[in-house]
Amino acid sequence: MPNIFSLICICLNSALQPSGFFFAKLPEAYAFLNPIVDFMPVIPVLFFLLAFVWQAAVSFR
C-alpha cells in the first residue's frame, strides 16, 4: 500500500511541474517520433473502448 501512495505522490508532483517528466521534449535525434509520442497516452483508452465494442458484438454474454 505505501508503494501505491508513493507512486501517486510522484505522479502528482511530476504533473504539477510544467518542466517535469510529462512535459519533457524529445531529443533532436528522436524528433520524428513526436506524433507517435503525442498519441501514445490515448492507446489505453482505445483498448477500453474496444472491450465495450467486443462485448456488444457478442451480446454482453
Swiss-Prot record:
Segments passing through the bilayer: 36-56
Keywords: Chloroplast, Membrane, Photosynthesis, Photosystem II, Plastid, Reaction center, Thylakoid, Transmembrane, Transmembrane helix
Subcellular location: Plastid, Chloroplast thylakoid membrane
GO cellular component, one term: photosystem II reaction center
Bilayer disposition of the protein: Single-pass membrane protein
Domain of life of the organism encoding this protein: Eukaryota
InterPro entries assigned to the protein according to its UniProt record, in alphabetical order: PSII_PsbK, PSII_PsbK_sf
Keyword Transcription among UniProt keywords: no
Pfam hit, one: PsbK
Propeptide: 1-24
GO biological process: photosynthesis
Principal subcellular localization: plastid
Assembly notes: PSII is composed of 1 copy each of membrane proteins PsbA, PsbB, PsbC, PsbD, PsbE, PsbF, PsbH, PsbI, PsbJ, PsbK, PsbL, PsbM, PsbT, PsbX, PsbY, PsbZ, Psb30/Ycf12, at least 3 peripheral proteins of the oxygen-evolving complex and a large number of cofactors. It forms dimeric complexes.
Family assignment from sequence similarity: Belongs to the PsbK family.
Function recorded in the entry: One of the components of the core complex of photosystem II (PSII). PSII is a light-driven water:plastoquinone oxidoreductase that uses light energy to abstract electrons from H(2)O, generating O(2) and a proton gradient subsequently used for ATP formation. It consists of a core antenna complex that captures photons, and an electron transfer chain that converts photonic excitation into a charge separation.
HAMAP family, per database record: PSII_PsbK (MF_00441)
Protein name as annotated: Photosystem II reaction center protein K
